[in-house]
Regions:
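Short, Lys/Arg-rich flexible segments
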Residues: 1-123
Length: 123
C-alpha cells in the first residue's frame, strides 16, 4: 500500500525565512521614516538666537527593534522640558506650533517612505 503524504518542511522553512526578512525590512523601513522625520523637525524647529542652547541641535530619534518596530522622534532631556513652551506659548510668548504642523506635514511622506522601503527590501 502506497502512502500519500506531502513533505511541507521546506515550505515551513521558507515561510519562517520570509517572516524574518519581513521583520528586518520593517525595522529598516521604520528607521528610514524616523530619520526623515527628525531631519524635517530640525528644519521646522524655531531658533532663539538669544540662548546658546538651541532645540534644533538636540533632536533625537530612537532606533526600532524587531520587538518594538517604532521610532520615536523628539528632543533630548536637555531641552525637552521647554519644547511645550514654544509649541503652546506662555503668558508673554505667542505660540509657535511647529511640532503639530510638522507632524501633519510629514505624515503622508513618512508613510510613503516606509512603504517604498518595505517594497524595495521584500523583492
Amino acid at each position: 500500500m502506497k502512502k500519500n503524504y506531502v513533505d511541507f518542511s521546506s515550505a515551513y522553512k521558507a515561510i519562517g525565512k520570509t517572516e524574518k526578512q519581513f521583520k528586518q525590512a520593517a525595522v529598516k523601513a521604520v528607521e528610514a521614516g524616523g530619520e526623515y522625520a527628525s531631519r524635517y523637525l530640525r528644519v521646522k524647529t524655531p531658533v532663539d538666537y538669544d540662548t546658546k542652547t538651541h532645540m534644533r541641535d538636540h533632536i533625537v530619534y530612537s532606533k526600532p527593534t524587531v520587538n518594538k518596530p517604532v521610532s520615536e522622534v523628539g528632543f533630548d532631556k536637555q531641552v525637552a522640558w521647554r519644547a511645550h513652551f514654544v509649541e503652546f506659548g506662555t503668558i508673554k510668548q505667542d505660540p509657535q506650533p511647529f511640532i503639530e504642523t510638522t507632524m501633519k506635514d510629514i505624515e503622508n511622506k513618512v508613510a510613503n517612505i516606509i512603504q517604498s522601503e518595505m517594497m524595495r527590501r521584500m523583492k
